[in-house]
């Protein structure tokens, strides 16, 4: 059993997914956006490119648009933009899930959204998840025809925890569990835990071995082990409980600075459970970070 670690990579629709991945052969797994993460738009893809990637067998995770809000609006159903935003999010997620399924991606990672009324928000997130896993479109029918089976059964959605900022949902394990408990097709829904987010929220102290052990205990008390499908491996610029989402290079932030042995303890836990890890910072230290992580768990 070896550590499965990679990073977020840039993707050009002109080059195609296969070429984008081939340029980063040192990675065990990959994450990318398949459309503009901050715009109301979707990208069309060559079916041949998606199928070529599927045949490659590479471990790919796709990150959904950052402007999706599975609640529709943080202001609730009385907000004038609620219906439009909810429809956009649901339509976009269903489209992205079909693209991911055709290319054989391991999951679509999504920030769950925000709501002032957290109880209502958790219910609305679950409603949206239940909706998009069943939703059918012309694209669904086309891709199902290509694969010779209902592609909706291959949709996999990964809900990501937040840093606890303002009205954002998914700030701790109990809140994630509240959402998950309302989801119908649990076998098609997993989680992505961002270490910076968990630390910044104050609910996951990855900076101490005891905190890491506590995280695993709490997680496995709430969820089946296979529900945690991915880690976003990021250090944090902010202190524990700062409620600020600012990633930092590994061993240079408030989680693991001068604490390689604690990072090693965390990595061993992920390795033993066969959970892939993706680095998200876009700087020139990624290769060095990969080298350090692999050396720590040799």
Where are these regions (language model features)?
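Acidic (Asp/Glu)-rich catalytic clusters
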Residues: 19-26, 44-62, 94-104, 130-152, ...
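N-terminal pre-domain/capping segments
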Residues: 1-95
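Aromatic/hydrophobic pocket-lining residues that form the small-molecule binding cavity
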Residues: 15-18, 89, 93, 122-125, ...
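Hydrophobic faces of well-ordered beta-strands that scaffold small-molecule active sites
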Residues: 3-9, 28-32, 60-64, 108-110, ...
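Active-site acidic/histidine proton-transfer and metal-coordination neighborhood
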Residues: 69-190
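Active-site beta-loop-alpha junctions enriched in small/polar residues
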Residues: 8-12, 33-37, 65-67, 113-115, ...
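Gly/Pro-rich active-site loop or hairpin
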Residues: 80-86, 119, 169-173, 177, ...
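C-terminal helical cap(s) of enzyme catalytic domains, especially alpha/beta-barrels
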Residues: 286-298
């Amino acid at each position: 059993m070896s550590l499965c670690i990679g990073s977020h990579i840039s993707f050009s629709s002109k080059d195609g997914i296969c070429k984008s991945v081939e340029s980063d052969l040192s990675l065990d797994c990959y994450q990318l956006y398949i459309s503009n993460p901050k715009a109301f738009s979707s990208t069309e893809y060559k079916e041949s490119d998606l199928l070529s990637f599927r045949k490659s067998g590479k471990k790919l995770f796709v990150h959904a648009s950052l402007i999706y809000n599975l609640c529709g609006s943080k202001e609730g159903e009385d907000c004038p933009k609620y219906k439009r935003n909810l429809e956009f999010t649901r339509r976009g997620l269903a489209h992205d899930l079909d693209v991911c399924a055709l290319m054989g991606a391991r999951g679509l990672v999504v920030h769950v959204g925000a709501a002032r009324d957290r109880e209502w928000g958790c219910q609305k997130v679950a409603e949206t998840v239940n909706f998009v896993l069943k939703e059918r479109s012309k694209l669904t029918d086309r891709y199902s025809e290509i694969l010779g089976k209902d592609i909706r059964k291959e949709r996999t959605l990964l809900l990501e925890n937040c840093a606890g900022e303002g009205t954002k949902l998914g700030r701790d394990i109990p809140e994630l569990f509240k959402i998950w408990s309302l989801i119908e097709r649990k076998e098609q829904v997993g989680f992505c835990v961002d270490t910076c987010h968990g630390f910044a929220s104050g609910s996951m102290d990855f900076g101490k071995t005891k905190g890491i052990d506590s995280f695993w205990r709490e997680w496995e008390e709430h969820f089946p082990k296979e529900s945690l499908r991915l880690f976003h491996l990021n250090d944090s610029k902010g202190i524990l409980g700062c409620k600020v989402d600012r990633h930092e290079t590994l061993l240079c932030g408030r989680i693991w600075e001068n604490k390689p042995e604690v990072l090693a303890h965390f990595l061993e836990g992920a390795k033993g459970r066969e959970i892939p890890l993706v680095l998200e910072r876009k700087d020139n230290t990624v290769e060095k970070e990969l080298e350090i992580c692999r050396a720590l768990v040799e």
